[in-house]
């Protein structure tokens, strides 16, 4: 009797991608933080775009525009909180990702490590400019 997940055309795609994934056995949960960084970044970009549609940066109306987002925009309060908490989650995932690289000795791959350091500094500079 043949296994349906290995013979059915659609189930075969799912099986090869998720169940019988050709990955080394030493991959742990620490390797998920790179993917979570991508998810957090997409969340930040999308919620930032939706918030920017209603935000005004004028000093006289900035606070009232944030109040408008929270009270008058449909689900504006949750978009604002997702954007604020997504930034914190992004940096938690970022530091866990760097910590995993330090723990497993990824710094020996100099080109990859240096690109990562440049991206880390660029991310920190962008976040600083967002707070200022």
UniProtKB/Swiss-Prot annotation:
Protein function: Component of the ubiquinol-cytochrome c reductase complex (complex III or cytochrome b-c1 complex) that is part of the mitochondrial respiratory chain. The b-c1 complex mediates electron transfer from ubiquinol to cytochrome c. Contributes to the generation of a proton gradient across the mitochondrial membrane that is then used for ATP synthesis.
Protein name per UniProt: Cytochrome b
UniProt record, GO biological process: mitochondrial electron transport, ubiquinol to cytochrome c
Subcellular localization(s) per the UniProt record: Mitochondrion inner membrane
Binding site for heme b b566: 97
InterPro entries reported in the protein's UniProt record: Cyt_b/b6_N, Cytb/b6-like_sf, Cytochrome_b_N_euk/bac, Di-haem_cyt_TM
Superkingdom of origin: Eukaryota
Coiled-coil region: none
Annotated binding of heme b b562, by residue: 83
Major localization class: mitochondrion
Cofactor binding comment, as recorded: Binds 2 heme b groups non-covalently.
Subunit structure: The cytochrome bc1 complex contains 11 subunits: 3 respiratory subunits (MT-CYB, CYC1 and UQCRFS1), 2 core proteins (UQCRC1 and UQCRC2) and 6 low-molecular weight proteins (UQCRH/QCR6, UQCRB/QCR7, UQCRQ/QCR8, UQCR10/QCR9, UQCR11/QCR10 and a cleavage product of UQCRFS1). This cytochrome bc1 complex then forms a dimer.
PANTHER family in the record: CYTOCHROME B
Gene (UniProt): MT-CYB
GO MF term set: metal ion binding; ubiquinol-cytochrome-c reductase activity
Family per record: Belongs to the cytochrome b family.
């Amino acid at each position: 009797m043949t296994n349906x997940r290995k013979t059915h055309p659609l189930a075969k795609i799912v099986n090869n991608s998720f169940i019988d994934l050709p990955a080394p056995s030493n991959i742990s949960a620490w390797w998920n933080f790179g993917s979570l960084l991508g998810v957090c970044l997409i969340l930040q970009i999308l919620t930032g775009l939706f918030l920017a549609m209603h935000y005004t940066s004028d000093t006289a109306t900035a606070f009232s525009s944030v109040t408008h987002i929270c009270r008058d925009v449909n689900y504006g309060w949750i978009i604002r909180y997702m954007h604020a908490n997504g930034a914190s989650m992004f940096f938690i995932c970022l530091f866990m990702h760097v910590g995993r690289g330090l723990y497993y000795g990824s710094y020996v791959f100099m080109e990859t490590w240096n690109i990562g350091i440049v991206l880390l500094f660029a991310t920190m500079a962008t976040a600083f400019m967002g707070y200022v």
